[in-house]
Swiss-Prot record:
The gene is FH6. The keyword Chloroplast does not apply. It is found in: Membrane. This is Formin-like protein 6. It comes from the Eukaryota.
Length: 899
């Protein structure tokens, strides 16, 4: 601000100097004409004396009464011209001549310059007045309490005796209407002294940069230090770094903490010269304010060296929000302790911590609980303070706050005391607190393990029921939607008694079981634990001893063990590494496990597991050979049945005639044969009524034809028409009974049968190679050699039956499909088509039987009309047959003629 004032004065004086120099140059130009005024008459003496006095006074009157400062008076250049005019008073003729030449112009210039100068000085004085008044009010609010007193009252409070302490409060960043005192409006001699403390507090750039929230409440001051004279040099030095570090380490109250607290709080009195942490104004230079008059301020009021303001340690990072919240909680918890501080007493020197704790423990039951004052209310006056209440060290306060946030609500209520010894207990975690935290963590972990994270700890744990839960379906109704929660009540007491997990009974069993298993693992565990356990379970399920297995393997008798046991023994076969370990084991066999003892007993027999495989092959050989023999025999019989079925041939003939009639005039007409796949398409062609299909029509025709051929008596034919129709329907329905082997063959896969034959042949080759090993132990090899001869003969027969069945299947396929049989990928597909058609034919026969029963239940008239319609259909079929013969003969004749 002072740089702005000096710049303004410079431009103003430059303008005044330029205007006066112009007027002086005009005056000299007139005085440089010495011969011209001699011829003129001298002016009267009163004309010279009238305008001469205002010349030296005109530039002096607007400046000197308003600005008493002497350095600004030396900048004015106008005084020399009036002095020269007075010195040259002996030359009246030129002066009278110049003033008589242009008196009006000179007077106008002087008057205008004076008016302009007076106006500018007035504006400057008003600007300085407003500026000082505004900053004086801000400084007054920072130092004084409610703004009820002016600057003189503020200085009286600050310059009082050191034994008294100001009860006013300190504001941070608040703005009130401007208040100007008498001492600030005028620039007296005490201006520098009075402006020094306020300018230091009003160093505006720091205050604007770290301005806190406008919701701050008035904070109580702290007692001043005992001997301020010791810190006066460091307080007044602008470059003090130790005071800046002390200021940064000083804690302060947040707005909410101050609102909830009582009148007293934690404050730190520190030197005002710590410019590194003091706020400054944007419009005032810190150096200019601090350099006003430090020595005078220190000599006149030594108490003004220390100003009670909160520390701005936590204001340094303004974007971070959590630190003020932690400060709020910590301040709320520290308030009861701060109420014990004296308000108007001077604190003694800091005592040692032992004496401090001993004194405060005696006064600890006096203060109220911590959170007793409600938030956002003016607290009542504090109780009488104890004689000693120094603030705690500021370096350890953040740790106190973090510990206070971590404790639980129960610990906070039990520890809500105002003694500093309790507060210091929160600085470092005590062994008791650590023990409580460890117990809580252990109990929480045990609950998670025992309850699996989901169970209710209030209910005892039961045995689990492993089921598959079904998700709720909102689009359909299920049986679970009809269940009600109150429809069935459980006897939970009995359930807990029957299915509860007895931790007391199961706990002793667990160590006993663990003490046995590691012993076996350490001494005699050779196999994999899981595999050993599985083998032991299988042995208990089969209920067989080692001696029985050894005897069967030695004699080669598979009937004594059975195929199931032999399959289990094959699964127990150890790996080569395990076999080597078991063979090389030379310790006590009784110490081995059940599985190890069993396998070691079996491995003592030469080629034990190869014998097991050979015996398993022998046990399954007869069953597999029988299955293959029956399968190939079924295929042979199915081929013969399909070729020899007269009724199936009649059915194919009826379908062929019906198809040719329906395809007359098209490329599909005049067919001689068709694939059996066409039989499955007869049900897809429906009549006009939408119910009768082409297969229904064919069945009815075959029924009528079969009934007439089986009955030779004409009287029976015309008299009992319903009887022969029923008889014909029974003949058609018996087609499925005639082709039983065809249905069986349709479920077979010839490739699978061929793979079974190959497997038997490969097993026989293995057995033959195994019997070539030289050994004389037991009768195993003798019995196996006998079986080998029989097996070779049976396999030759099976392979012959396979070739015969395959040839017959191909023959029957060519019998019905002709040359198209070569295109069949599946050799047994013809049996599958016939099987599917027989199923559809059975359903159609049932429907036709139902229709006949409905027709016979009607009256005689309807029965006679039905007979007429039945007999009338016979000539139609004969005519159709005759027409078909004629058309076929004509087509043959035309083909012969064309050739």
């Amino acid at each position: 601000m002072k740089a702005l004032q000096s710049r303004f004065f410079f431009f103003f004086f430059f303008y005044i100097f330029f205007s006066v120099s112009v007027s002086s140059e005009a005056h000299r130009r007139i005085l440089h004409q010495p011969l011209f005024p001699e011829s003129s008459t001298p002016p009267p003496p009163d004309f010279q004396s009238t305008p001469s006095p205002p010349l030296p006074d005109t530039p002096d009157q607007p400046f000197f009464p308003e600005n008493p400062s002497t350095p600004q008076q030396t900048l004015f250049p106008p005084p020399p011209p009036p002095v020269s005019a007075d010195v040259n008073g002996g030359l009246p003729i030129p002066t009278a001549t110049t003033q008589s030449a242009k008196p009006g112009k000179k007077v106008a210039i002087v008057i205008s310059v004076g008016i302009v100068t007076l106006g500018m000085l007035s504006a400057l004085a008003f600007f300085l007045y407003r500026h000082k008044a505004k900053h004086a009010s801000d400084t007054q609010k920072l130092v004084t309490g409610g703004g009820d007193g002016g600057g003189s009252r503020r200085f009286q409070e600050d310059s009082g005796p050191p034994t008294t302490t100001s009860s006013t409060f300190l504001y941070m960043g608040t703005v009130e209407p401007t208040r100007v005192s008498a001492s600030e409006s005028n620039g007296g001699t005490n201006g520098p002294v009075n402006s020094s403390p306020y300018r230091k507090l009003n160093s505006a750039k720091r205050s604007e940069r770290y301005r806190p929230s406008p919701e701050l409440q008035p904070l109580p001051p702290l007692a001043k230090p005992p001997q301020p004279s010791d810190n006066s040099p460091s307080a007044l030095s602008p470059s003090s770094s130790s005071s800046g570090e002390e200021c940064r380490d000083t804690a302060f109250y947040t707005p909410h903490g101050s609102a909830i607290s009582s009148d007293d709080g934690y404050y730190t009195a520190f030197p005002r010269s710590a410019n590194g942490s003091l706020p400054h104004s944007k419009r005032t230079s810190p150096r200019s304010k601090f350099g006003s008059a430090p020595t005078t301020a220190a000599s006149r009021s030594p108490e003004m060296k220390h100003v009670i303001i909160p520390s701005i340690k936590q204001k340094l990072p303004p974007p971070v929000q959590p630190p003020p919240l932690r400060g709020l909680e910590s301040d709320e918890q520290e308030l009861p302790y701060s109420q014990n501080k004296p308000k108007f007493s001077q604190p003694p020197p800091p005592p040692n911590r032992a004496a401090f704790q001993a004194i405060t423990q005696e006064k600890s039951p006096v203060p109220p609980p911590r959170r007793s004052p409600p938030p956002l209310q003016t607290p009542p006056p504090p109780p009488p303070p104890p004689p000693l209440a120094p603030p705690p060290p500021p370096q350890k306060r953040p740790r106190d706050f973090q510990m206070l946030r971590k404790v639980t609500n129960s610990e906070a209520t039990t520890n809500s005391t105002t003694s500093p010894s309790r507060k210091q207990a929160f600085k470092t975690p005590s062994p008791k607190t650590k023990a409580v935290e460890e117990v809580n963590s252990v109990s929480a972990g045990s609950l998670e393990k025992s309850g699996d994270g989901d169970t209710d700890p209030s209910k005892p744990k039961l045995k689990p029921l492993h089921w598959d839960k079904v998700r709720a379906s909102s689009d359909r109704a299920t049986v679970w939607d009809q269940l009600k929660s109150s429809s069935f009540q459980l006897n939970e007491d009995r359930m807990e008694h029957l299915f509860g997990c007895n931790s007391g009974s199961s706990a002793p069993k667990e160590p006993v079981r663990r003490s046995v298993i590691p012993l076996a693992e350490n001494e005699n565990r050779v196999l994999d634990p899981k595999k050993s356990q599985n083998i032991a379970i299988l042995l208990r399920a089969l209920n067989v001893t080692r001696e029985e297995v050894s005897e069967a393997l030695t004699d080669g008798n598979p009937e004594s063990l059975g195929a199931e046991l032999l399959e289990t023994l094959v699964k127990m076969a150890p790996t080569k590494e395990e076999e080597i370990k078991l063979r090389e084991y030379s310790g006590d066999v009784s110490k081995l496990g059940t599985a190890e003892r069993f396998l070691k007993t079996i491995l003592d027999i030469p080629f034990a597991f190869k014998r097991v495989e050979a015996m398993l092959y022998r046990a399954n050989f007869d069953a597999e050979v029988k299955y293959l023999r029956n399968s190939f025999q079924t295929l042979e019989e199915a081929s013969l049945e399909l070729k020899a079925s007269r009724l199936f041939l009649k059915l194919l003939e009826a379908v062929l005639m019906t198809g040719n009639r329906m395809n007359v005039g098209t490329n599909r007409g005049d067919a001689i044969a068709f694939k059996l796949d066409t039989l499955l398409k007869l049900v897809d062609i429906k009549g006009v009524d939408g119910k009768t299909t082409l297969l229904h029509f064919v069945v009815q025709e075959i029924t009528r034809s079969e009934g007439t051929t089986t009955t030779k008596d004409e009287t029976i034919l015309h008299g009992n028409n319903d009887g022969f129709r029923k008889q014909g329907l029974q003949v058609v329905a018996g087609l499925s009974r005639d082709l039983v082997n065809v249905k069986k063959s349709a479920g077979m896969d010839f490739d699978v049968l061929s793979s079974y034959v190959t497997k038997l042949e490969m097993g026989l080759d293995k057995l033959r190679s195994f019997l070539k090993t030289e050994t004389t132990q037991g009768r195993f090899f003798d019995s196996m050699k006998t079986f080998l001869k029989e097996a070779e003969e049976e396999i030759r027969k099976i392979k012959g039956g396979e070739r015969k069945a395959l040839s017959m299947v191909k023959e029957v396929t060519e019998y019905f499909h002709g040359n198209a049989a070569r295109e069949e990928a599946h050799p047994l597909r013809i049996f599958m088509v016939v099987r599917d058609f027989l199923g559809v034919l059975d359903n159609v026969c049932k429907e036709v039987k139902t229709m006949q029963e409905m027709s016979t239940s009607m009256g005689s008239a309807s029965a006679r009309s039905f007979r007429i319609s039945a007999t009338a259909s016979l000539p139609v079929l004969h005519r159709y047959k005759a027409r078909q013969d004629d058309t076929s003969s004509d087509s043959e004749h035309s083909s012969n003629s064309s050739t």
